[in-house]
């Protein structure tokens, strides 16, 4: 059986894509936080490359809906 390869930096990929798509929509992190009912500080931590902060699938889903982006687009 072929061994699967996993992206060890998946959270970094998602963080960068959240920030990219948010900016493409002309949205601030505060606006995104309000849409997904999370604190502005929490969204900033998610987007920060300096913070090793992981987030739930629920949060990931809410952000994708708020940004009108498919989940798989956020992990590419």
Residue ranges and their predicted role:
Residues 2-24:
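A short, Lys/Arg-rich alpha-helix, primarily the initiator
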Residues 17, 28, 56-59, 70:
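Residues that mark the N-terminal boundary/hinge immediately upstream of a DNA-recognition element
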Residues 23, 34, 65:
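Alpha-helical residues within the helix-turn-helix
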Residues 26-46:
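Short alpha-helical DNA-recognition segment
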Residues 50-65:
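Short, basic-rich loop-to-helix N-cap that marks the start of a DNA-contacting helix
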Residues 68-76:
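Short C-terminal boundary/hinge segments that cap the last helix of small helical domains
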């Amino acid at each position: 059986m072929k061994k699967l390869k996993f992206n060890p930096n998946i959270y970094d990929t998602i963080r960068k894509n959240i920030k990219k798509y948010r900016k493409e929509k002309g949205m601030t992190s505060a606006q995104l936080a309000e849409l997904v009912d999370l604190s502005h500080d929490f969204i900033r931590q998610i987007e920060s490359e300096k913070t090793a902060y992981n987030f739930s699938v629920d949060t990931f889903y809410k952000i994708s809906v708020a940004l009108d982006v498919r989940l798989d687009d956020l992990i590419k």
